Regions:
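Conserved acidic carboxylate
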Residues: 8
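The feature encodes the CheY-like receiver
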Residues: 14, 56, 86
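Charged docking surfaces used in two-component/phosphorelay signaling
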Residues: 15-23
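Short hydrophobic/Thr-rich beta-strand motif most characteristic of the beta2 strand and flanking loop
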Residues: 25-32, 40
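Acidic catalytic/metal-coordinating carboxylates
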Residues: 32-36, 59-65
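His-Asp phosphorelay/catalytic-motif detector in bacterial-type signaling
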Residues: 45-47, 72-77
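Active-site residues of response regulator receiver
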Residues: 52, 82
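Alpha4 helix (beta4-alpha4-beta5 surface) of REC/receiver domains from two-component response regulators
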Residues: 62, 85-104, 110, 114
Length: 129
């Protein structure tokens, strides 16, 4: 199915997300910090990326801007996840949120699955996230 890259420094969250995505039939990989995340994104050319908004070394906004400048990832939909920020804070901070969504941690499993399906299908959210 889809190629999905997770960039998050929380090993437990990443392990859970990888398990869910692989169970759903997706090819999924992860990076624990922004620099290796950028390298994997360039090589993998994912269909969707899941980013933690607060990581050591870079904010989600900085990583987002770098991903948008890269030809391999400039159109890739991005799902931001954070336990520390609101959707409005995040989506207002980035310059072009087109195709981007937000889920608050802890993530509810059905919300996560629905959001992934919608984003991969290019659909708009059914309700505010």
């Amino acid at each position: 199915m889809a190629k999905i890259l997770i960039i998050d420094d929380d090993f437990e969250i990443v392990s859970l997300i990888l398990e869910i995505l692989k169970h759903e039939g997706h090819e999924a990989d992860s990076a624990g910090e922004p620099v290796s995340g950028m390298q994997k994104a360039r090589a993998m050319k994912p269909d969707l990326m899941i980013l933690d908004y607060h990581m050591p070394g870079a904010t989600g906004a900085h990583l987002f801007e770098s991903l948008r400048r890269n030809t391999a990832t400039h159109n890739t939909p991005i799902l931001f996840m954070s336990g520390e920020a609101s959707p409005d804070d995040i989506l207002n901070e980035i310059s072009d949120s087109n195709g981007s969504r937000f889920l608050a941690k802890p993530v509810h499993l059905e919300d996560f699955r629905r959001t992934i399906r919608e984003m991969l299908a290019g659909e708009s959210p059914e309700k505010p996230q």
